[in-house]
UniProtKB/Swiss-Prot annotation:
Entry's EC annotation: 5.4.99.12
Active site residues of this protein: 55
Any one GO biological process: tRNA pseudouridine synthesis
Pfam families xref list: PseudoU_synth_1
Species annotation: Thermococcus kodakarensis (strain ATCC BAA-918 / JCM 12380 / KOD1)
Family: Belongs to the tRNA pseudouridine synthase TruA family.
Record's keyword annotation contains Methyltransferase: no
Entry protein name: tRNA pseudouridine synthase A
CDD domains: PseudoU_synth_TruA_Archea
Length: 267
């Protein structure tokens, strides 16, 4: 039996997703609780895997981990796990095939970036956004790791206008390190008149002098991962606990935003 958990988390509370010694990570928090409850013995023995290794500061509304429970699979449900987890919430669980891998089975991933509207030229942003769709060399828009192919295919980039802010949605099967955050910053530069569509086209063909720097990680969230044929089931008490925790964070953030908003109005 193999189980998969859909997890959400507040990225500002962690040094990234992937476990590493001496710092608090999302994987580390989940593994600690699974071991505490006797569901797994170790990540290696129980084939613990994650879908997306989000960077420090990046949040998720839909990431996935999978493992083979040693015993007590009945405890691996949102109600129980969310009672023990901190800054991570289990929103659903699914029993999956033995060969399931959360990264390789993903059909596509959708990221969202939340961007305060600085008076952007939205038509220029959308023109630039359309250039990223398709198969391109993203060397200028990524922090390249040795041996990794810079060619990636992006399925969709949308600029969605909200009241006072924008949501940038980027969808594709796989992404390079910092790729989404650098795409977002390119769109921001286009919206401010600091970057032209022709320059973006050249950069996507591999012609560039300087790379686009990444936007801050705090605005990015892994919004969705599509797994055909797999449904994650939650439970009422577990979801209620998650909603309560997330509302507390929303309330604190809104209070701080209102405070600094009045500062700006006064000065």
């Amino acid at each position: 039996m193999k189980l998969a958990l859909r997890v959400a988390y507040d990225g500002s509370a962690f040094y990234g997703f992937q476990r590493q010694p001496g710092v608090r990570t999302v994987e580390g928090e989940i593994i600690k609780v699974l071991q505490k409850l006797g569901i797994i013995e170790s990540p290696e023995k129980n084939d613990f895997k994650g879908a997306s290794r989000t960077d420090r500061g990046v949040s998720a509304f839909f990431n996935v981990v999978s493992f083979v429970p040693s015993e007590r699979p009945d405890l691996a449900r949102p109600e129980v796990l969310n009672h023990h987890l901190s800054d991570v919430w289990v929103l659903g669980i699914a029993e999956v095939p033995d060969d399931f891998h959360p990264r390789f089975w993903a059909k596509f991933k959708t990221y969202r970036y939340y961007l305060v509207n600085e008076g952007f030229d939205l038509s220029a942003m959308r023109e630039c956004a359309s250039l990223f769709v398709g198969r391109h060399d993203f060397s200028a828009f990524a922090k390249l790791e040795p041996g990794r192919d810079p060619i990636r295919e992006v399925e969709r980039v949308e600029v969605i206008e909200r009241q006072g802010y924008l949501v940038i949605e980027v969808q594709g099967k796989s992404f390079l390190w910092e790729m989404v955050r650098r795409i977002v910053n390119a769109l921001r530069f286009c919206g401010l008149g600091l970057l032209e569509a022709e320059e973006v086209e050249r950069m996507l063909s591999g012609e560039y002098g300087k790379k686009i720097p990444p936007a801050p990680p705090e605005g990015l969230v892994l919004w969705h991962i599509e797994y055909p044929g797999i449904g994650f089931e939650g439970d009422e008490k577990g979801i209620k606990k998650a909603r309560r925790d997330i509302f507390e964070r929303y309330s604190r953030a809104l209070t701080r935003a209102a405070l600094f908003g009045d500062f700006l109005l006064e000065y």
